[in-house]
Amino acid sequence: MNGNLGQLVMVTRAEEAEGFPPLLAEMLWRGNFSRRPEYSVFARGLGPGMVDYVATVFIPRRFVERVMEAHNISAHGTSIEMAIQEVAYKAMARCECV
């Protein structure tokens, strides 16, 4: 999966974060997902002093009522926190959890 994402710099469940990560966790909990989403953040150098962060989140398919495709979503940001916020937002917009 790490193809050209860069160097892994962090894996987190973003439990202390504010903004979209706790909203995504709440949305998934209400949709009968049993675990908080886990975010992986990769860093890729773009030039002198320039780093592109790519956060990914994997949301497994749900086994309650109907089958849903698993989602592997990624987003870019200029900081680790921004990339996590962006990927959580994209996951909320893309998932049909509730």
What are these regions (language model features)?
Residues M1-A70, G77-Q85, Y89-V98:
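N-terminal segment of the canonical double-stranded RNA-binding domain
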